[in-house]
UniProtKB/Swiss-Prot annotation:
Protein function: Participates actively in the response to hyperosmotic and heat shock by preventing the aggregation of stress-denatured proteins, in association with DnaK and GrpE. It is the nucleotide exchange factor for DnaK and may function as a thermosensor. Unfolded proteins bind initially to DnaJ; upon interaction with the DnaJ-bound protein, DnaK hydrolyzes its bound ATP, resulting in the formation of a stable complex. GrpE releases ADP from DnaK; ATP binding to DnaK triggers the release of the substrate protein, thus completing the reaction cycle.
Biased amino acid composition, Basic and acidic residues: 1-12
HAMAP family: GrpE
Name under which the protein is recorded: Protein GrpE
Organism annotation: Pseudomonas putida (strain W619)
Subunit structure: Homodimer.
Any GO BP annotation: protein folding
Subcellular location per the Swiss-Prot or TrEMBL entry: Cytoplasm
Keywords, comma-separated and alphabetical: Chaperone, Cytoplasm, Stress response
Amino acid sequence: MADEQLNEKDLNAEEAGAVDNGARVQELEEQLAAAKDQSLRAVADLQNVRRRAEQDVEKAHKFALEKFAGDLLPVIDSLELALAHSSAEDEQVKKIREGVELTLKMFQDTLKRYNLEAIDPHGQPFNAEHHQAMAMQESAEVEPNSVLNVFQKGYLLNGRLLRPAMVVVSKAPSAPQPSIDEKA
């Protein structure tokens, strides 16, 4: 009988030890899963930081010329104005005009190499993202909300707006006001 009680105690102790070992194994497995999850998150965070840094460097390279290009735009505007206000037939101005044309072409070619493109929207529909309306003018010849005149060209640098085009936008002609005689 004493042996049976000892055997029962040993069995109970072994069962309790097995239960303790099973709980310990489960606890360790949970800790392992948490550690794996934490390491995966750390790797993902590192990849995100690396990707963001690469994107920031790419943007810095892409738009590093933004201020410099913006400072050159008035020079281009001045050259274009000089050509617009000079006569190609005037012999005294002809050589100077040719020089200004060549200088302007060199400027434009250089800017194209750096992905700076002009926006000259004459006759196109008004686009508030790329155009700045300076005035509205009635016109029966073109669709309403079309660009009638361009005061100043706009420019895009790598597809991003550097300067909006300043434009005159058409509007539908208003109906003539009836005269006093017609109202009566």
